[in-house]
Amino acid sequence: TGLKESIGVITEDAPIGSRTITASLTGVSAGSWVCLVLGTPELGNTNDDVINSELSPYRWQDIKVQQGTTPNIKTNGIQIFEYHQIEKISGNSVTFKEPIMHAINKDWGWNVHKFANYANVGVEDLTFKGHAKEKFIHHGSDIDDGGFKLIDFVRLTNSWMRRVNFESVSEAMSITS
């Protein structure tokens, strides 16, 4: 995931759309990339209020499942990952270049993690020709599902692809954090 250990806890609420959070962070400065994490990189937050806020206007208790079972969203919880570049830090006030996408409730256990990434990676002016199978069978073989997956952008920031053509491929490109 590119996420390092937690470098601080968010200590004040922040509304959706805000560009500033309150947290005492270590080892980062203006220009650094971080990830706001609710839950942990490994485990989800199973608090009813947290889950229901993500499902609003619905509630996890309203999810219809087989009698006697608990929905996965309650059993496994939810994880939220928001990636941001720091614009400035002043004391415990951390301002991002872009607004946050979730309302921050300090009581829910939001943490800040360093985000290991690569920047300014680009692919331009190329044509990729595969040899995808004519008769596709979902999960039929490795060739069916990913044999001609050509580009995988992983943990990239400020990166691009332009004037690139793909012919006879099963998956041209993936972008993951």
Predicted regions and their residues:
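Right-handed parallel beta-helix
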Residues: 119-130, 157-170, 177
